[in-house]
Amino acid sequence: MIQSHVSVMLNEMLEALSPKAGESYLDCTFGAGGYSKAILESCNCYVTALDRDPNVIKRAEEIQQHYGERFDFVETNFADSFAKLKEKKFDGIVLDLGVSSMQLDIADRGFSFLHDGPLDMRMSGQGLSAEEFVNAAEEKELADVIYKYGDESFSRRIAKRIVEYRKTARIDSTSKLAEIVRSSIGFRKGKIDPATKTFQAIRIYVNDELGELEQFLVNVKNILKKDGRLVVVSFHSLEDRIVKNFFKENSEKPVVRSKYAKDDMTIDPNKWLKIITNKALAPSDKEVGLNIRARSAKLRAAKAIYE
């Protein structure tokens, strides 16, 4: 039995993607499999799912056992997926950016300040860990990362406190880092935890999340069929800005023309997208009430008008 999972903006994603029987879809961020399962359930279509986190393989195997040849899983990050997909093209592509509930809820992964665990935060388990970064980075670099990726106005104060603390002891757990941040800027009851932005910033940095997103978008045209849809759910203003600008730069502005004008407009192959969502969609108040992690989500979608 496949375990249930609360996926953010699931209905909005399905409406924007508009799956059809016999078509193939790419879920670039498999996570707990919520999007993949919903797409497979919507019609008799096919889904290829990607994820760099080896801990999701068991969940992928469960879905594969249930849906058979209609589902395929590839262990890779989406930015490096193009070579592994072997020039395959899809009728729709969906990205659910950020960290999954499954990663947040496992203390040993080190993503969350709500659970004490080793300060890791690596999605793939490889590369620079959060612990290594926090204990080795210069104060200015710490402040820059926390400000840039967390939009944290107290970034300099937090960075200074981190450097002071590590002179006496290594920062090797999520609880230690969270307390350092809280002691730097104070904790107000009922407000968002002061550690939220710092944890987000460090996670984005060590996993190069924005770099991967940009690299993927540059190449996505090569794997999206004509009339195929690209749906992106983001959770951070920087992610959303990247997606918004990409859609804008690669789409034609609507032109109101006279019915008497000759149809001699030159087609610009670089303007290969048509934006479906004029403004980013946000989750309903009801969804946010049921799943607080949805509060910052934004969904944008576009359709390929040329290959």
UniProtKB/Swiss-Prot annotation:
Keyword rRNA processing among record annotations: yes
GO terms, molecular function: rRNA (cytosine-N4-)-methyltransferase activity
Reactions performed catalytically: cytidine(1402) in 16S rRNA + S-adenosyl-L-methionine = N(4)-methylcytidine(1402) in 16S rRNA + S-adenosyl-L-homocysteine + H(+)
Catalytic class of the enzyme: transferase
Keywords carried by this UniProt record: Cytoplasm, Methyltransferase, rRNA processing, S-adenosyl-L-methionine, Transferase
Localization annotation: Cytoplasm
Main location: cytoplasm
Superkingdom of the organism of origin: Bacteria
The protein's Enzyme Commission number: 2.1.1.199
Family of the protein in this entry: Belongs to the methyltransferase superfamily. RsmH family.
Protein's name in the database: Ribosomal RNA small subunit methyltransferase H
The encoding gene: rsmH
